[in-house]
Amino acid sequence: MTTRRGQRRSASRRHIRPSSGGPGRRYIAAVGMAVLAAALAACGSSSGGSGSSSSTASVPAAKNLTQLRQSVTKASASVTGTYSPGPAIPDMASLKGKKIMALPGTTLIPTCLQDAETIKSIGDAAGTPVTMINDTGEISQWDSAIDTAITEHYSAVDFMCDDTPSLIIPEIEKAEAAGVKVFGYALTEPLKDYPGLAGGTLEPTYSDYSTMLDQAFVATGGKPINMLVISSVAVIGNAQDVAMLKAQFAKMCGSSCHIYVSDVEVPDWGTKIQPTVQTQLLTHPNINVVYPMFSGEYTYVLPAVEASHRSVLVTGAFGGGTPQVQLQTNSASNKIIIGDMTSDPVWAAYEMYYQTALDLAGQTMRPLSDTYTPNILITTANAGQVLTGAAWGYGFVNSYRKDLGLPPLSGAALQAAATVGS
């Protein structure tokens, strides 16, 4: 399927120059998805959908398992080649003293917290003092933080963690009117769809869905899948993403599979996702895949699946926070979690700060279409490399530091800078 997002993804490839013979990289969303595939024995007839059997004969994806396995292998390959962020900022001295607020979105999600911590580290080193807000995902906290940025004359707010700026557009417009620039992380739509937002970074989502479906069918050996999707359609673009996911799922699985959708909005994730998933698993015992569409949902989905006492495999894009990656190195949990499609929190944070600094220095920001960072499918096989930073390499750190007028790092200091939040 050709999509606008797919076109933007292709355009970004010029920023990673793969070494000769090295694997190409997928550029995909930080917006998280998870596939929790129940053991095949859990498959049964679908309530409200087509019956599901153990046969692969009627599943189109089963005919392409070799290709799907290649897709999964490619997605889990390490990043190779050199990286160039964009133009240098020669007047970084003019930014010294400008205050920046790092708003994690929620400190309860490891990757969101680690994104914000990295921005604080970079900004403090560059002379732009960064204040990090300790929020827990409540919209009222985000509104309050923006109000603080206005009254205390901050220059910018970096709003991290997925597409959450879409939920407080009026507050962002108020900040714009007061001269405070708000930047959004991992946006999924063009900037014009976010009134008041000064800029940010883009993460197209369709290729995520495609890769995760590939992984699900590989994990189930091409057998029929009955899937529960957890959406949050109040987030800009998510309703369209649900429609695209349904279309791709139907194309890959035909009439042998069934998809259920439960919508839980961001403010309700902490209280409603776990009981919603538990209820759906009880109501529809044929469900063998649970697919949260945002990284923050995974935290609440996994306990619900575990409480169902059904043998499960887990794969998805949970955001790459250290605790989640470490689960794949644990002998007990790595038999459950078989994949995590994610960007490097450090790399993503550098890109976000770089965009902010470009704008504050009066330079032209990079187009959103050029701002998303390379993702890797983390598995039990490469989780160790991810935790040491080796999967993404360390070169990107000094590339950004050069453009930001910061001295290069080497040795242990470079590795430490590249692995904060991995």
Region locations from a protein language model:
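Extracytoplasmic "Venus flytrap"
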Residues: 56-65, 69-118, 122, 131-143, ...
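Hinge/cleft segment of the Venus flytrap/periplasmic-binding protein
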Residues: 57-97, 344, 349-422
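C-terminal motif of bacterial Sec signal peptides marking the signal peptidase cleavage site
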Residues: 38-42
